[in-house]
UniProtKB/Swiss-Prot annotation:
It is found in: Cytoplasm; Nucleus. The gene is DBP2. Coiled coil: none annotated. This is ATP-dependent RNA helicase DBP2. A motif (DEAD box) lies at residues 279-282.
């Protein structure tokens, strides 16, 4: 079946007729679903001309009290009774077929690419070779991307082939488009949504910031197909999210907690999901979401296509993979060993807690010599985040804070101010900053060191993205001594100069591989009191973000 043909021709020629029969035969009326999909749920759903518009609104989740919650249980799946669906759309381009095995291996070696599994498709080298339908290819070209990234070159053929797959690559390497574009092709091959239908594509993400960014990409590239999406996350009113689900969306991007809430209160279901994405799986597990992930995935038909994306490959992710992926193929860009990008200059200063504030200001003066610079500062706690921001603002630095105690509209506003450069200094906690993809961050400053080396690598990875250069400054105190050995190892691997003051912590921590240790006490901001914690009802700016600005430094 060609996916480059006009929609009208495809549908008027009944190329999807088999789907109509499958769904009209009451496949969803079996005990698995309690008869909620009656015999004619999809009757005539494929008739007529599609004309480029995905009609067939979902909706109608009624029949349950607003406050009624039903605990999710694992369905007993009978695959023979489920309607069949298409998931292999890959047709290898002649230029790709013509490449010899030695040429393929040379390409993979050049891009530090390793593949594991059976019958792995060859990588592509250009957008035209990917085999996308014209309506997807045109969207990509309109965005002006010069060529696919390494993960896209191998990830697209894998995803389009319908195989379960694992993609491991650094944050900022183009993973989102690696699953977003194939999902559009997948959706357009499925029957239209009917009343009461949930999404066809489900993307799980660890944080609301990352979920929103994924939604922006899906909206951008799904526009020509009129594919609808929604973003389901906590910390925001449920009303609009519920209305989106009731109207029907083909793509749902969600954080695990809020999605379970929507499922247990009957606001949506996962019966139609045939394309599942777990994005930043390592961070979701680090944040304790494994029980929620398992509960959600158990609600999805087991013959779905599952795509797992991660920046690292810890044992916990491997276990999840064995439990939920079927004969997966895997692509890794770079080393499986934890490593920092070689395009980032790492500077570590060993000092006392009382020296940190002065050193922070000195580094800000250096960073902002470039008037276009964006600086991301990490603190260990929400309180410290607010106190650093208040101090910087009083000293004339245009800083704003983002952390979990800020309301969602304020977090969105802070992120916009930072992205546009109106407030080029952002102070954040780890959870708030995870997944934030802001172009042009030139400096990352670890005012407080993280508790483990994985978080250090994730933090400094906010700069030096997509081949650009960046600088990461870390203020290291005696309280961080247990992190010393791993920090020295990361710096050496990236060919960075390890300061002599740090080497004594390397000897003290020799052989350590701290994964979840807290790295000793973190130290505090220095007894600054509790001011600046109010939420502020009069507008976006709460607490530290509403602190008065001194004479602006730059």
């Amino acid at each position: 079946m060609s996916y480059n043909q006009n929609y009208n021709q495809d549908f008027n020629n009944n190329s999807y007729g088999s789907y109509g029969n499958s769904y009209n035969n009451n496949s969803y009326g079996q005990n698995n679903y309690g008869g909620s999909y009656g015999g004619n749920s999809y009757g005539g759903g494929r008739g007529g001309s599609r004309g480029g518009f995905r009609g067939g609104r979902g909706g109608g989740f009624g029949g349950r009290r607003v406050d009624e919650r039903v605990e999710l249980t694992t369905p007993e799946w009978d695959l023979d009774s489920l309607p069949k669906f298409e998931k292999n759309f890959y047709s290898e381009h002649p230029d790709v077929s013509a490449r010899s095995e030695s040429e393929v291996q040379s390409f993979r070696k050049e891009h530090d690419m390793k593949c594991v599994g059976t019958d792995i498709p060859k990588p592509i080298t250009s957008f035209d070779e990917a085999g996308f339908p014209d309506y997807v290819l045109n969207e990509v070209k309109q965005q002006g991307f010069p060529k696919p990234t390494a993960i896209q070159c191998q990830g697209w053929p894998m995803a389009l082939s319908g195989r379960d797959m694992i993609g491991i690559a650094a944050t900022g390497s183009g993973k989102t488009l690696s699953y977003c574009l194939p999902s559009i092709v997948h959706i357009n091959a499925q029957p239209l949504l009917g009343p009461g239908d949930g999404p066809i594509v489900l993307v799980l993400a660890p944080t609301r910031e990352l979920a929103v960014q994924i939604q922006q990409e899906c909206s951008k590239f799904g526009a020509s197909s009129r594919i609808r999406n929604t973003c389901i996350y906590g910390g925001a009113p449920k009303g609009q999210q519920i209305r989106d689900l009731a109207r029907g969306v083909e793509i749902c991007i969600a954080t695990p907690g809020r999605l379970i809430d929507m499922l247990e209160t009957g606001k949506t279901n996962l019966r139609r999901v045939t394309y599942l994405v777990l994005d930043e799986a390592d961070r979701m597990l680090d944040m304790g979401f494994e029980p929620q992930i398992r509960k959600i995935v158990d609600q999805i038909r087991p013959d779905r296509q599952t795509l797992m994306w991660s920046a690292t490959w810890p044992k916990e992710v491997q276990t999840l993979t064995r439990d939920y992926l079927n004969d997966p193929i895997q692509v890794t860009i770079g080393s499986l060993e934890l490593a920092a990008s070689h395009t980032i200059t790492q500077i570590v200063e060993v000092l006392s807690e009382f020296e940190k504030r002065d050193r922070l200001v000195k580094h800000l003066e250096t960073a902002t010599a470039d008037k276009e610079a964006k600086v991301l500062i990490f603190s260990s706690t929400k309180r410290a985040c607010d106190e650093i921001t208040s101090y910087l603002r009083a000293d004339g630095w245009p800083a704003l804070a983002i952390h979990g105690d800020k309301q969602q509209n304020e977090r969105d506003w802070v992120l916009r101010e930072f992205k546009t450069g109106k407030s080029p200094i952002m102070v954040a906690t780890d959870v708030a900053a995870r997944g934030i993809d802001v172009k042009g961050i030139s400096y990352v400053i670890n005012y407080d060191m993280p508790g483990n080396i994985e978080d250090y690598v994730h933090r400094i990875g906010r700069t030096g993205r997509a081949g650009t250069t960046g600088t990461a400054v870390s203020l290291f105190t005696e309280a961080n001594s247990k992190l010393g050995g791993d920090l020295c190892k990361i710096m050496r691997e990236a060919n960075q100069t390890v300061p002599p003051e740090l080497l004594r912590y390397d000897r003290r921590s020799f052989g350590s591989h701290i994964r979840y240790g807290r790295g000793g006490g973190r130290g505090g901001w220095g007894g600054r009191g509790r001011g600046g914690r109010g939420r502020g009802r009069g507008g976006f700016q709460s607490g530290s973000n509403g602190a008065p600005m001194g004479n602006r430094r730059f």
